[in-house]
């Protein structure tokens, strides 16, 4: 039997992810009889707290990666998209906004608190990450009060989106990381451009309706906008009907970003795709 692996993107999270793929091809390829031995060769592990009296092991840093690369070259090949497709280069732009008033005061208060928590070695990694997410939410126009209720702080990103769309011709993809923002964007677009102007792909949309949304975005002239969460709609879809992609908000996942960019920048795209980060 012949075994092969085909992947659309390189390993983006950790070199350690290679072990199971190579073991599937042939357990002898990398020269290790166990994952533990492989991990010890290519990663220095450390422990972080994740709760009361609970710790998990994570890589502190990777090592001997040139050796691993040489081993991979013996049985793998890589062809980049620009080597097999005639696509125009991606164009990138950024639109900056400044926090003002109440939002700025809340951000500064959260920032000071977050710095204290991040520097405290006794506090778990998940709690530290929560503080960073709170800052990110304020930048995206909302926060949660002490009762867990969502509070709107500003419209600056929506205003920036309005300006961009006023300058843009053709269809547009708008990616947003938070459900709050997705609903806000959809409401704005349907109010200004009409109920049929916008389709969406995110967690609340069922699989059948997601497929319909893609088909309408690609083929229906009445549909101008696709609003989605890149973690939900950013993989495997063809959305080449547009040449403008707006990132209203981002996550911290690089793989999600790359994959969502390539929904428009793929086979069938004739124009130059512009990516705008707010």
Could you tell me what each predicted segment is?
Residues 1, 5-6, 31-170:
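Inter-lobe coupling linker of SF2 helicases/translocases
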Residues 1, 70, 74, 96, ...:
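Helicase-associated low-complexity regulatory tails and linkers flanking the ATPase motor
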Residues 1-36, 84-111, 224, 228-278:
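SF2 helicase/translocase ATPase core recognition
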Residues 7, 139, 176, 202, ...:
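Short beta-strand/turn micro-motifs composed of small residues
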Residues 79, 136, 157, 210, ...:
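Short, cationic motifs built from Arg/Lys/His that form the positively charged side of catalytic pockets
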Residues 149-151, 202-205, 250-252:
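Short, contiguous acidic/charged loop-to-helix segments that flank catalytic cores in large enzymes
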Residues 154, 177-180:
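Helix N-cap/beta->alpha junction signal
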Residues 173-175, 183-186, 192-233:
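Conserved helicase ATPase core of P-loop NTP-dependent helicases/translocases
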